[in-house]
Amino acid sequence: MSDTNTEKPELVSLNKLSEMRTNIGMVKRYWNPKMGFFIEPERKHNNDLLKLDLQYQALKTAYNFIKDVVKNHGQILFVGTKNDYVKKLVIDIAKRVNVAYITQRWLGGTLTNFKTLSISINKLNKLVEQQKQNANDLTKKENLLLSREIERLEKFFGGVKNLKRLPNLIVIDDPVYEKNAVLEANSLKIPVVALCNTNTNPELVDFIIPANNHQPQSTCLLMNLLADAIAEAKGFETLYAYKPDEQIQIEIPPKQERQVINRSNTRNITNQRLNINRQQQETL
């Protein structure tokens, strides 16, 4: 006789969260006192530590809420414009679970002036359709100009071109960096799910996930787990949710070395250019 009371595996283990450094906060001097409830008394080096048990509870709450939004046919928008890694991560996630995304600079009024945004989206969709239907009738120059305009619009609106109405939920990797998006969502009472580091004002976020949003492995794990809620609600395979630790493999990008500027060489080049300019003037 099979055991019908077998418990579902945990969403993600605390060991995996710790391994991915999801609980490493920012340096103490950057902390927001309103995040104090989520912070451990001790620190690691000079960084605050976030409470893993509270992080896990918050993650599960947000996960279940996202599932409910999807099951009720709500639209979800992922936002991440902070750096190249986050942009690529958000694009990959959004395409995996088929939701809208914004990875370019947040344009003021994206939510609060959605009618204007819709005009740009409609223009993009019409131009794409026009290029498909009239590709053979356009001259080479006309086709080039049309492609450039589509590329320009695609850059800013490509991720939201299927968004027919305001989203029912916004998922953000860094509410401090994406403050304008958070404030617009707040003004329209659109719920916000966000990874909140120790420098965040949690009062601006509806579903707070106290977490390290400054390191790639942490951001990758947590944002993908939130996307897995969408995948589960749609009947897709999850990437990380409910998987054993050994199946969760996250590639950590190498740190980019800082370029050291040799100021003496810079001065020499500048002086050489000045000498060349003087010589040119003397020959005139």
From Swiss-Prot:
It comes from the Bacteria. Pfam families: Ribosomal_S2 (PF00318). GO terms for molecular function: structural constituent of ribosome. The keyword Metal-binding does not apply. GO terms for cellular component: cytosolic small ribosomal subunit. Signal peptide: none annotated. GO terms for biological process: translation. The keyword Lipoprotein does not apply. InterPro entries: Ribosomal_uS2 (IPR001865), Ribosomal_uS2_bac/mit/plastid (IPR005706), Ribosomal_uS2_CS (IPR018130), Ribosomal_uS2_flav_dom_sf (IPR023591). This is Small ribosomal subunit protein uS2. It comes from Mycoplasma genitalium (strain ATCC 33530 / DSM 19775 / NCTC 10195 / G37) (Mycoplasmoides genitalium). The gene is rpsB.
